[in-house]
C-alpha cells in the first residue's frame, strides 16, 4: 500500500475532513478538495516514470466501517474531482455531476462514499504540465510525460489504498470516464464489484481520432504555444485552445439539438433581413461556439488538452488481444451497467452494444439501457428521468446486496 501525505504547503482547507457536509436535502453540501501526495514512483505505459505526484480529490458521504460502500467516479475530458456539491471558495461552482451524486440522488451519498479524483495531467489541482518539475524548478510544459487511461487507473488505485478500500462497490464514469471504469474492471478485477459505463466506447473511431488531431493542431500551431513551454513566455495559446473547444463542442451535441437551439437564427440581422456579407458572426450558432471556446480558453490548460485527447486516442484494450474485445474483457469479474443515448454520434449506441455482446460472450452479468434522448453525447451529464431511473435502480440493487438500505452514520473520515 502506498502512503500518501497531505501537502503541507497547501492552504488549510486542503486538510479539511474529506466527507462533505450536507447543507440541504439533495445537495452534497459545501465541499473542499484534499490534495494527496504520493512519493512512490509511478511507472507509465510510455516507459517513463513519474517520481512523486499529487492528486486532488473530493469525497461525499461516509465510508462505512467495513469499507464496502465506496464508489469511484472517473471524470471526462474537461471535468475534475469536483463531482457534486458546491465549492467552498465559489458558491457558483456546482459539481459537474451534481444531478447524479448526492443525498437521495441516483448515487445516494446517504448510502455510498463517493470519491472524485482529478486525473494526473489535468489542470485542476493534480500534478500536470503546469506543475513545477522538481528536476528543473520550472513548469513541466511539453516535458510532462504522455499518459494513458491505464496510467490514470494505476494512480487512482493508490487513492483507494489510502482509504483502505480493497474493493469498490462500483467504479463509474461517462465518456472518457467510462473508459477508465472499463479499464478498472479489466486491470483490477478483484477491486471492482460493479462497473458503470455511460456514453462510452471500447476505442476511438478514425473519425474521433481525426477530430482530436484537428483540435491539437489548432493548439500546436497557435503562435503563443511555443512548443508547449508557453508558461515561460507568459503567453497562453488561447486562440488555438478556443478553436479546439469549438470543434469538440460540436461533437458533443446532436444535429437535432443544434437545430432546435439555433437553427439558422441570425445574430442581429440587418433591418431588411439581408446578410451582412462578411466574416464576423452572422448566425447564433457561431456566437455560441465562440463564447464556449473563449470561456474554455480562460480556465483550461492547452497542454492538458493535448495530453487528455492523446490518452483518448490510445485507449484500445482489445489491441493486446488482436482486436478480440471479448478476450480483452475476459479478466473482468464485475457486474456491468452500460448506458448509451440514441443521438450520441460521438460514441454511438453501437459501441455500447459491442461491449455488451463481448461481456455476454464471457458470461458477465450485464444490464444495458439505450435512452432515446435528443441531446447527443452530452446527454450523460443531463437530468433525464429515464436515464436517472436506470442508474438509481442499479445502485439500489447494489445497496440491497451490501445491506446499505439505511444511511451510514458519519464517523469523521479524513484524509
UniProtKB/Swiss-Prot annotation:
One of its GO terms (cellular component) is cytoplasm. The active site is at 175 (nucleophile), 344, 377. Residues 69-383 form the AB hydrolase-1 domain. This is Homoserine O-succinyltransferase. SUPFAM superfamilies: alpha/beta-Hydrolases (SSF53474). It comes from Bordetella pertussis (strain Tohama I / ATCC BAA-589 / NCTC 13251). It comes from the Bacteria. It holds the Pfam family Abhydrolase_1. Keywords: Acyltransferase, Amino-acid biosynthesis, Cytoplasm, Methionine biosynthesis, Transferase. The keyword Acyltransferase applies. InterPro entries: AB_hydrolase_1, AB_hydrolase_fold, HAT_MetX-like. One of its GO terms (molecular function) is homoserine O-acetyltransferase activity. The record marks 346 as: Important for acyl-CoA specificity. HAMAP family: MetX_acyltransf (MF_00296). Substrate binds at residues 245, 378.
Amino acid at each position: 500500500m502506498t502512503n500518501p501525505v497531505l501537502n503541507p504547503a497547501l492552504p488549510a482547507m486542503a486538510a479539511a475532513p474529506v466527507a462533505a457536509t450536507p447543507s440541504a436535502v439533495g445537495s452534497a453540501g459545501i465541499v473542499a478538495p484534499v490534495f494527496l501526495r504520493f512519493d512512490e514512483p509511478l511507472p507509465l505505459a510510455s516507459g517513463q516514470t513519474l517520481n512523486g505526484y499529487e492528486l486532488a480529490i473530493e469525497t461525499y458521504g461516509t465510508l462505512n466501517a467495513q469499507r464496502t460502500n465506496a464508489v469511484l467516479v472517473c471524470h471526462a475530458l474537461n471535468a475534475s474531482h469536483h463531482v457534486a456539491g458546491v465549492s467552498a471558495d465559489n458558491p457558483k461552482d456546482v459539481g459537474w455531476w451534481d444531478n447524479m451524486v448526492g443525498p437521495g440522488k441516483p448515487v445516494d451519498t446517504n448510502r455510498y462514499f463517493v470519491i472524485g479524483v482529478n486525473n494526473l495531467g489535468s489542470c485542476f489541482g493534480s500534478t500536470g504540465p503546469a506543475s513545477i518539475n522538481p528536476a528543473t524548478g520550472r513548469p513541466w510544459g511539453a516535458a510532462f510525460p504522455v499518459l494513458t487511461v491505464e496510467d490514470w487507473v494505476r494512480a487512482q488505485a493508490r487513492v483507494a489504498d489510502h482509504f483502505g478500500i480493497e474493493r469498490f462497490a462500483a467504479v463509474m464514469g461517462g465518456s472518457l470516464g467510462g473508459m477508465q471504469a472499463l479499464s478498472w474492471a479489466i486491470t483490477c478485477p478483484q477491486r471492482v464489484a460493479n462497473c458503470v459505463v455511460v456514453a462510452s466506447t471500447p476505442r476511438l473511431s478514425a473519425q474521433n481520432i481525426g477530430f482530436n488531431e484537428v483540435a491539437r493542431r489548432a493548439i500546436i500551431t497557435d503562435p503563443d504555444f511555443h512548443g508547449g513551454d508557453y508558461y515561460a513566455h507568459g503567453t497562453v495559446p488561447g486562440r488555438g485552445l478556443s478553436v479546439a473547444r469549438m470543434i469538440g463542442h460540436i461533437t458533443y451535441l446532436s444535429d437535432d439539438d443544434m437545430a432546435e437551439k439555433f437553427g439558422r437564427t441570425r445574430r442581429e440581422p440587418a433591418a431588411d433581413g439581408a446578410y451582412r456579407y462578411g466574416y464576423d458572426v452572422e448566425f447564433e450558432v457561431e456566437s455560441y461556439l465562440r463564447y464556449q471556446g473563449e470561456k474554455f480558453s480562460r480556465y483550461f490548460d492547452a497542454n492538458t488538452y493535448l495530453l487528455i485527447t492523446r490518452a483518448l486516442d490510445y485507449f484500445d484494450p482489445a489491441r493486446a488481444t488482436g482486436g478480440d474485445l471479448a478476450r480483452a474483457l475476459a479478466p473482468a469479474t464485475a457486474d456491468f451497467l452500460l448506458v448509451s443515448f440514441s443521438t450520441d454520434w460521438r460514441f454511438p449506441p453501437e459501441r455500447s452494444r459491442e461491449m455488451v455482446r463481448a461481456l455476454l460472450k464471457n458470461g458477465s452479468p450485464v444490464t444495458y439501457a439505450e435512452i432515446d434522448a435528443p441531446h447527443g453525447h452530452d446527454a450523460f451529464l443531463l437530468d433525464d428521468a429515464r436515464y436517472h431511473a436506470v442508474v438509481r435502480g442499479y445502485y439500489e440493487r447494489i445497496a440491497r446486496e451490501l445491506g446499505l438500505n439505511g444511511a451510514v452514520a458519519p464517523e469523521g473520515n479524513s484524509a
